[in-house]
Amino acid sequence: MNSRERWLAAIRHEKPDHVPLYSQCFGFTAPPHLRWQQGGREVEHWYSMRHEHLHTWPEPWSVEHDFERVRRWASLEVDDVLEVSPPWSIHPEVRIRDWQEPPHALERYWQICREYETPAGPLRHVVRRTDEEVGPGWVVQPDHVALFEDLNIPRGIRHAVVSPADLAKLRYLLHDPTPSQLADYRERITQVRRFAAEQGVLVLGWSAFGLDAVAWLCGVERTVMAAMTEPDFFQELIDVVYAFDRRRTEMMLEVGGVDVVVQRGWYSSTDFWSPALFQQFLTPKIRLLADLSHQAGTRFAYVVTTGTLPMADQILSANVDLLFYIDPTKERSDLAAVKDKFRGRVALVGGISGAVTLYGGSREEIRQAVHTAVRQLGPRGFILAPVSSLTPDIPWPNVEAMIEAWREVRDIN
């Protein structure tokens, strides 16, 4: 089997030639023997093009970098994937004004401000510019207020959406891609499709933001409180976001070249939501995107990294094929219980914590974690992966220990 065939066999709950291993990179510090020269510089930290609309990298990254990263992982037999994220635009009548304001008696940080002048009125977004020193490889705060950006949430002074009156304005910021953007995306997909076919690599298409977008737009506290105290406002906001997600997904499926549609859900776990609220606001929307993907002949994946079992019935009823990520350090039930719940219906990705086990575990602890994950979650319907990525601070010897342990146990029956 090639890597794509191995992934698809796992997603279909067939037995692959061995359990796949996948490692999402989010600034991963590659060891010297896996680096390469590109654009006159050594590529020390690895990323993914799926982040291009969400984060500001400290170093150059392109689809060509993605291709070389896949090759480097393949040299270690790791089942890397290619990832794409469709573009979008703002309404042509929207005007943007950016400025910064200095600290004052009530605010110790500089404030980065952006105002969108839309046909429905102005929409202002203000965050703190914290200027903290970050280590090599970590994403950085941009010099403007991006609409969708994880770093905005703890730094927010005025989030983009604070009341129902902002929703009409928001719609002008979530428009379809321009002809130029669409042409560029089609060219990108042509390159990705060609490389994926030549190398036998799976392609993931990240076209749906879901509740992550709501958290970026409103802040976490406002998002959760709105769901409980202003359900009509929250439902309309969800409808706006999912209409946007659906259009991006339809465009991505029309262009083609994607094996699995993925919806983000880092902010949709039981850290924030009860199963009842998830069922009320999210499950119907997830099911719509899953059904849309299935009609186009692709699989559908969802991301939730904590509280998997409490949300299991909602995930199952949403027709999800693949679930990222199962983190054993965050699950209150053992991995075998998780496997029993989803067996034969939803394939699982994860099994080892990147932030805990790979970051600070001993070689033996890593080995035991890998063996436990593969034995309890495999061999069918499972892709072993660090949850949820390899970050710049995870030591290479620990990644190497994970790979070695995986080779010991990947052929388990």
Residue ranges, per PLM feature:
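Short, solvent-exposed loop/edge-beta patches enriched in aromatic
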Residues: K15, S48-M49, R108-W110, T118-P122, ...
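Active-site loop segments of alpha/beta catalytic cores
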Residues: M1-G40, V145-N413
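Residue-level detector of functionally special positions within alpha-helical transmembrane segments
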Residues: N2, E77-D79, G121
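Segments that shape or occlude catalytic/ligand-binding pockets
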Residues: P32-W99, A105
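Short hydrophobic-aromatic micro-motifs
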Residues: P20-Y22, H53-L54, Y116, L123-H125, ...
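Generic hydrophobic, aliphatic-rich segments that mediate packing or membrane embedding
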Residues: D66, R108-I112, R188
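A contiguous, low-structure linker/loop signature
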Residues: H91-L173
